[in-house]
């Protein structure tokens, strides 16, 4: 017969292969009413949370004669892909069509500062490949997803549940296992299994294209321009290095629609206390990046951590 995409069937408690409901067993079925198909499910301590393409349900054990019962939780938030939900520290985090949510007894939308970046450049036709993940050591939940120009996963977006901030990047990973069973997270791509959050090298060589970049922040007040005259870096190098360094790049723009202009690139080492620069505008972006020169032995095993870097900013007129 035809398959009902909204039907849940469960087996007998004594025989996992027996799905035919009989008066002598606990097998049975339940049909969901809201949506056109069941997309995915996540098990938590007290319930199984089931997602259709439009709704969220809670399925709980109630005992005989019904065995299980389902309750409709929300009708406006379906799951975008079968693996797009994951259990985190505060509930079940999931990706829907155009937004991110958390379920912890009720469904709540997560405020997201990068929503437009993700969903304006996103391959909806490959949404079934999205998979959510947790990096519990760093209080992170995230999603690997395909951009509009790719049929495969090539990007990620992460929500830090402790800091309540978002960040994103480019990375191809098709499966992820958080630390716990193993000491470090494990992820796969191109038939390789990679350990994450360990070491600072790329298979024995210095890593390239390592950076962290801020979003735009206002340095001018309304119609005022401002100038940045110096940077006091707060960068801790994670091992003894004599020749390793990072670059702090300062970019500015005068109007929101303008392109960013790089005004200064300052090399920062463990001995740098201040870098003098000249940058003027209304908005700025600061980027900290590793030096990509693999011939420099100081860049091998170079790890660093960014703290609260300070800028010397002064008002600089109206034009």
How does the language model describe each region?
Residues 1-130:
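Beta-propeller and closely related beta-pinwheel folds
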Residues 36, 76-91, 97-319:
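Beta-sheet repeat architectures centered on beta-propellers
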């Amino acid at each position: 017969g035809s398959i009902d995409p909204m039907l849940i069937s469960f087996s007998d408690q004594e025989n996992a292969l027996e799905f035919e409901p009989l008066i002598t067993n606990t097998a049975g079925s339940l049909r969901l009413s809201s949506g056109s198909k069941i997309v995915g499910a996540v098990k938590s301590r007290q319930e199984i949370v089931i997602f259709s393409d439009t709704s969220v349900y809670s399925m709980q054990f109630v005992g005989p004669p019904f065995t299980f019962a389902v309750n409709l939780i929300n009708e406006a938030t379906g799951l975008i892909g079968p693996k797009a939900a994951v259990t985190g520290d505060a509930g079940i985090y999931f990706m829907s069509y155009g937004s991110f949510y958390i379920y912890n007894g009720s469904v709540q939308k997560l405020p997201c500062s990068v929503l437009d970046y993700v969903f304006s450049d996103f391959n909806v036709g490959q949404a079934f490949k999205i998979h959510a993940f947790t990096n519990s050591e760093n209080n992170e939940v995230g999603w690997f997803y395909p951009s509009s120009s790719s049929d495969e996963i090539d990007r990620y977006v992460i929500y830090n549940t402790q800091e309540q901030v978002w960040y994103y990047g480019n990375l191809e990973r098709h499966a992820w296992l958080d630390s716990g069973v193993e000491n470090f997270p494990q992820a796969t791509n191109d038939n390789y299994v990679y350990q994450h959050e360990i070491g600072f090298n790329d298979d024995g060589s210095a890593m390239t294209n390592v950076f962290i970049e801020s979003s735009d922040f206002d340095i001018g007040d309304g119609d005022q321009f401002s100038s940045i005259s110096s940077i006091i870096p707060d960068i801790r190098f994670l091992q003894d290095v004599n020749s390793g360094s990072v670059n702090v790049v300062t970019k500015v723009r005068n109007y929101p629609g303008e392109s960013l202009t790089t005004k200064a690139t300052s090399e920062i080492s463990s001995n740098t206390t201040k870098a003098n620069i000249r940058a003027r505008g209304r908005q700025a972006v600061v980027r900290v990046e590793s030096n990509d020169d693999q011939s420099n032995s100081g860049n091998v095993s170079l790890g660093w951590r960014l703290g609260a870097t300070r800028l010397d900013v002064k008002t600089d007129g109206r034009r």
